[in-house]
């Protein structure tokens, strides 16, 4: 019990100039895109090997260490939460150090630079999770500790050349670095498989299903059926461009956000995704939304699949040993995969039955502007339930329909059956693949997407009071704010009557937009827009909302921001052509 209380009481070659032009040349002022992240100021930290004790690392607020060779990691952070809704974090590690030390150093830089944001995120999401749920948290603590012990045993049992388990070890090295720096501990590069609040933050998605497995009493204000996200892949007319976008939808307490790039000094042949860029959260190693671009030329997104078949929540399908939680598997898949098929195959290992999603993985290497797509391996999906996992090449669909949309409903028939979605769809079109509001809006409006601006407009779309597909047999108003590509459940009527529980008033809305096209992807860039959709809807304002008792420490009151076009300071090289077999 002491450990339990400790766990949840802690608060992460320019052409040669012609001589006769020398006197006629004047410098031209560089004009930055007003939406570019390049205009922001950054705080820098270097993580350096201690000059007298090589078993310790030091944090230096500078771009360099006194001894250049001692620099393990460089971190850069710009806190723009009050101007854009985002923090921007860049982490680079250096190949002169071992992988373990690099991973730990990357965590140290993040834990130091984003300590305040980690604290706010902890308070908003983790601090109260055991309030009135003491018995549940006992069960959870035992389950998670058993899982951590099993993973540690597998790391020890498998050779260090095993790519999967090596990356598990590196993941926990990075996590340990965040925890140690955040907690202002001695920075000794070690790898801890420990339960602490920073670890709990990684489990945000996995907790949806662990809550059900371990019988946590449901919170009536939580979104009941996992309609967390909208995802979209689109070919421009004539295949002139390609787009991939995502909207995360969740509790509004989750709007403490960070845009990140990790650039590890790993061997690119061993770790093709050694650079990843993503939208995420303070102190969290993976996107969780998810929206991730990798240096191997892949982008992965997901939308959550609710499990209505409660018989799946048993130790037959979900157990602490023999399984690896979703957040770790997604991180490893991003780092190690060269192709979409490799990604979905890698992710399917050690299925934990937690954070059950439809993943969509796009291989940009297979795309050439104005050229016909190959017949295979451009777009892969995977779908998961407890005890079952299936993948499929969806290139044919993208070629035939020029788009693929993901909206929290399984595409694969067996997954639909196992999860219970097929029974739900027979009762309400809300749960029908192809027939739900977002499915019908995507099908109607996808052809309007021709550039990054029209992509942004579609993914932020919500005009529910005028949208025919948002209408419902509801009172007092015959429509729902959940009936848009980006939800506004906070605008529904408290105490209203809705056909389906998830149509109603909830602490649930679109939190963002992320999208990229081919030119942006080539530099691992994307556009990001923080906050719930507005115009024509009202701007979200914590001072003027019907939501009560929703934690939002460190958040701006008014979310009237516009988008940011990311321009990383770090050089980010991406694989642009298919790998040789």
Curated annotation (Swiss-Prot):
Family per similarity comment: Belongs to the phospholipase B-like family.
Entry-listed glycosylation sites: 50, 82, 132, 169, 215, 309, 543, 546, 560
GO molecular function: phospholipase activity
Subcellular location: Secreted
GO terms for biological process, alphabetical: phospholipid catabolic process
Disulfide bonds: none
Pfam families the record matches: Phospholip_B (PF04916)
Primary localization: secreted
Signal peptide start and end residues: 1-16
Presence of the UniProt keyword Zinc-finger in the record: no
Reported function: Putative phospholipase.
Protein name (Swiss-Prot/TrEMBL): Putative phospholipase B-like 3
Top-level taxon of the source organism: Eukaryota
Enzyme Commission number: 3.1.1.-
One term under GO cellular component: extracellular region
Keyword tags: Glycoprotein, Hydrolase, Lipid degradation, Lipid metabolism, Secreted, Signal
